[in-house]
Amino acid sequence: MIEPFLLGIILGLIPITLIGLFVTAYLQYRRGDQLDF
């Protein structure tokens, strides 16, 4: 059984991780678009 506190941390980190990955990919895409890769 998962503790509510641990579950809360996991549910809190997942959206942050997804947003971080999305922003990183977007910045790399923009950077690559500017450099014409």
Swiss-Prot record:
Q: What is this protein called?
A: Cytochrome b6-f complex subunit 5
Highest taxon of source: Eukaryota
One Gene Ontology BP term is:
cytochrome complex assembly
Q: List, alphabetically, the GO terms of the cellular component aspect.
A: cytochrome b6f complex; plastid membrane; thylakoid membrane
Question: What family name appears in the similarity comment?
Answer: Belongs to the PetG family.
For this protein, the parts annotated as crossing the membrane are 5-25
Subcellular location(s) of the protein:
Plastid membrane
Source species taxonomy: Eukaryota, Viridiplantae, Streptophyta, Embryophyta, Tracheophyta
How is this protein situated with respect to the membrane?
Single-pass membrane protein
Q: Please classify the protein's predominant subcellular localization into one broad category.
A: plastid
Q: Which HAMAP family match?
A: Cytb6_f_PetG (MF_00432)
Q: Name one GO molecular function term.
A: electron transporter, transferring electrons within cytochrome b6/f complex of photosystem II activity
**Assembly:** The 4 large subunits of the cytochrome b6-f complex are cytochrome b6, subunit IV (17 kDa polypeptide, PetD), cytochrome f and the Rieske protein, while the 4 small subunits are PetG, PetL, PetM and PetN. The complex functions as a dimer.
| Chain's role | Component of the cytochrome b6-f complex, which mediates electron transfer between photosystem II (PSII) and photosystem I (PSI), cyclic electron flow around PSI, and state transitions. PetG is required for either the stability or assembly of the cytochrome b6-f complex.
Instruction: Tell me the keywords, alphabetical order.
Output: Electron transport, Membrane, Photosynthesis, Plastid, Transmembrane, Transmembrane helix, Transport
